[in-house]
């Protein structure tokens, strides 16, 4: 029939399990899932005496699993690939090998004139991607874990980083963000747009895991890089550091 298959909701386990590779891998409880460049993550980890502890292999590239010593215990850092379905494939594997709590960290587009130098802690995400529907019944938004978001906001404030709560529009159609859609999404309360948040939050909810997401606008980063006093040149490193500090508290 003409009914969209995205509406078929089924809670039963998948035929392929996320630990299908049966790797001898025991990850720590906490992880930072970073939509940032590979070299940047590697530099950040090595500068803090961290090391590579394994690799998630995918058809097109390998994703190194980095470990760093945080205040209390070890913490894992993994690069996140762009796009909801690709990102969820890796989030699932993090959870399958022992991770319980994840802070995702990434760039977003601004749907309105936003204050400069602000980081956003996502409270809800509009499900305009396909992946979340494989994890949760159809709904317009997915609500993110409230206590996790509160903790993350607290950590950012403690570190004197301006932050605000937000709703994000998670879309698969990067090049299909039309004027009308932007207007409509803004009317629904979305201040920023990203590609993965709704799917990651849905996956976490289905698996019963803790998940939070920090977003920063490309323009924010551009502005931050000129804010020498507080931020220095490596604004993205600051974002990574905040992700680590937030994950430690979850």
Predicted regions, residues:
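Preference for short coil/turn "hinge" residues that link or interrupt alpha-helices
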Residues: 8-9, 188
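N-terminal low-complexity or amphipathic/hydrophobic leaders
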Residues: 11-60, 69-71
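Glycine-rich phosphate- or other oxyanion-binding loops that anchor nucleotides, phosphorylated ligands
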Residues: 56-250
């Amino acid at each position: 029939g003409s009914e969209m298959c995205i509406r078929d909701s089924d809670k039963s386990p998948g035929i392929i399990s996320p630990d299908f590779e049966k790797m001898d891998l025991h990850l720590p409880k906490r992880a930072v899932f970073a939509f940032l460049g590979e070299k940047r993550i590697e530099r950040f980890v090595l500068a803090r005496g961290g090391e590579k502890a394994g690799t998630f292999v995918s058809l097109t590239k390998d994703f190194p699993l980095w470990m760093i010593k945080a205040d209390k215990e070890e913490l894992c850092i993994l690069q996140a690939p762009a796009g909801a379905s690709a990102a969820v494939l890796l989030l699932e594997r993090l959870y399958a090998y022992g991770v319980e709590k994840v802070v995702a960290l990434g760039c977003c587009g601004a749907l309105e004139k936003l204050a400069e130098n602000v980081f956003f802690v996502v409270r809800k995400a509009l499900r305009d991607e396909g992946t979340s529907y494989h994890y949760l019944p159809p709904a317009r938004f997915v609500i993110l874990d409230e206590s996790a978001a509160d903790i993350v906001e607290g950590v950012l404030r403690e570190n004197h980083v301006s932050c605000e709560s937000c709703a994000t529009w998670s879309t698969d159609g990067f090049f299909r963000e039309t004027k009308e859609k932007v207007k409509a999404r803004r009317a629904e309360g979305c201040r920023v747009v990203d590609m993965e948040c709704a799917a990651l939050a849905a996956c976490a909810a289905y698996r019963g895991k803790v998940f939070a997401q920090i977003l920063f606008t490309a323009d924010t980063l551009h502005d931050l890089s000129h804010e020498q006093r507080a931020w220095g040149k490596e604004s993205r490193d600051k974002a990574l550091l905040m992700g680590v500090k937030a994950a430690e508290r979850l």
